Every structure is written in C-alpha cells, then in structure tokens.
C-alpha cells in the first residue's frame, strides 16, 4: 500500500489515496501502521475517498483503530495532498467528513500548499448533541466536575466531535497521562471526549495541551483548538480571535459571530512518501 506521512503542527497521520488504494480492514490497518515501534508511527490513518457530496471525503481512524469523526489538522493536510499530488487544481475545495462538509481555502507558494484556512462551521453547545450529560442542563459552560478526586470547571463543545475544555493555571504542570484517560472515559460523556487543558496567556492568546479520545496526548488538535478558543470567548477570557499555542505549533482561530462559524488557519506539511506491505494485516 502506498502512503504519505503528513502533519499539521505535529499532529501526524498516515494518508492513503483511496481513490487508487483499497483497504479491506481500515480499523486493523490503522492500529498497525500507527504503532511508533512496529508500524509507520502516527496519531492515526486518514483515507482520502471519493464523495458524491463534496470534492473529496475524509475517513479517519485513531491510533487505537477506532473511527474518528473529524480532525482539523487532518483536513488541512488532505487539502495539501489533493492539490500537491494533482488530484485538483482548485484553491477552494470542499471535503466531506463525519462532522459535516468543510470548505477550505488554500494558500499556494511555488506550486505547493503551505497554509490552509478551514471553515469549521458552527460550534455546538447543546449538551445532547455533544453528547454530554450534566444534570438537566441544556449547556455545560464552566460547570464543576469531579475527576480523580479533584474539582475542575469544564465547558463542553462539539466541533463535529466532543470536546471538554478545562482552564488551568499551567499546562506544563498537568499530569496528562494520568488525568487524560479519566476525563476521556468520564460517565458524563457517553461517546468519550477529547479534553483540552488551557492556560490563558492574555486576552488574545492561549496555551493548550490535548488528550484525544482513542489517541492519547497529541502535539496538536485542530478541532480542539477551535473548541478551546470558543470556550475562552464564552467564558469572557478572550475575544473572538485567538492565537492557540500547541505543543507542535500555532493555529489562528477566529469566531465569526455574524456567520456563527469558526475559521481555523494553520500549516500543512508533507514528511515523506512510502509503501508498506500489509500481508497478514489486511488480507
């Protein structure tokens, strides 16, 4: 199977052109190739597929083999892939995801995509649509939750996938390997949750660490950055335009109140192309 390793702010996936390649068991293949010791090594696998609703369709799989709904960094890399590898010559494209159809504007330099702006659509705060269960509340904004014996305040948002945003004094002091799984599997989240730990730098800047469901800590999460920026705005900690410092780089997030949509702008990088023998894995 031919593949391309790509990343957005260090959030790395193995990309497969499924307009040409066929994968019989994507869950098993994703788990195998994501292993950083025995596989290629990545946060998961993303398949670029045909779509009857958009220019292309994204099918994403986490490193544990589970299927994901949406990945902001991943969708930017798809945009770079399809342009750089000649699958399209358009600089505005649409990509179908399980979290909705996304529109992307491509910045091209010397024939290659360098930056991508994504319309991530409207953030969802209705608890039943995230889903998040919290008493009889219709929205969960800055509400206390006990995790591993400690009280945190959490804001729940969906960007096509569920997020719980928690503000902390210092992201460096979070024992994310210990607390991340406790949030991910908390009973208030029936479909598990991605958890963002946020440190406020100023009213235009935040630092973020993320524990992704099915993947653990990653260097970046685009939908998480969007959820975190919007949560910062809802909690009156920042304005509508926020620079998010992630472990793997920076993303610019802007909430357009008039359109009720979030725009994410960030880089997309190709690491290398390769081919892997999946005999015994995808038979």
Question: Whereabouts are the PLM-identified features?
Answer:
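Active-site glycine-rich loop that binds ribose-phosphate moieties when present
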Residues: 124-153
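Active-site/binding-pocket entry motifs
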Residues: 123-124, 270
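Membrane helix-loop-helix hairpins that form the core translocation module of multi-pass transporters
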Residues: 115-123
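A glycine-rich beta-to-alpha transition motif near the start of alpha/beta enzyme domains, typified by
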Residues: 1-112, 164-283
């Amino acid at each position: 199977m031919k593949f391309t390793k790509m990343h957005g702010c260090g959030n790395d996936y193995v990309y497969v052109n499924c307009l040409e390649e066929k994968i019989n068991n994507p869950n098993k293949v994703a788990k195998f190739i994501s292993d950083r010791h025995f596989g290629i090594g990545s946060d998961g696998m993303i398949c670029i597929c045909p779509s009857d609703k958009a220019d292309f369709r994204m099918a994403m799989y986490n490193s544990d083999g589970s299927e994901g709904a949406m990945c902001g960094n991943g969708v930017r890399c798809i945009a770079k892939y399809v342009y750089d590898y000649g699958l399209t010559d358009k600089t505005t494209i649409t990509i179908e995801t399980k979290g909705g159809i996304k529109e992307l504007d491509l910045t091209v330099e010397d024939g290659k995509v360098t930056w991508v702006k994504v319309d991530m659509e409207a953030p969802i705060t209705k608890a039943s649509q995230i889903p998040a269960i919290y008493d009889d509340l219709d929205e969960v904004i800055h509400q206390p939750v006990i995790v591993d014996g400690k009280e945190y305040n959490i804001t729940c948002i969906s960007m096509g996938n569920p997020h719980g945003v928690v503000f902390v004094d210092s992201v460096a002091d979070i024992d994310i390997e210990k607390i991340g799984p406790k949030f991910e599997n908390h009973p208030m989240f029936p479909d598990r949750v991605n958890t963002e730990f946020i440190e406020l730098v100023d009213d235009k800047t935040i630092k973020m660490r993320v524990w992704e469901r099915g993947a653990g800590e990653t260097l970046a999460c685009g939908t998480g950055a969007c959820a975190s920026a919007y949560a910062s705005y809802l909690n009156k900690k920042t304005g509508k335009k926020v620079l998010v410092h992630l472990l793997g780089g920076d993303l610019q997030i802007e909430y357009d109140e008039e359109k009720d949509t979030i725009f994410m702008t960030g880089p997309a990088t190709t690491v290398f192309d390769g081919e892997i023998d999946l005999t015994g894995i995808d038979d």
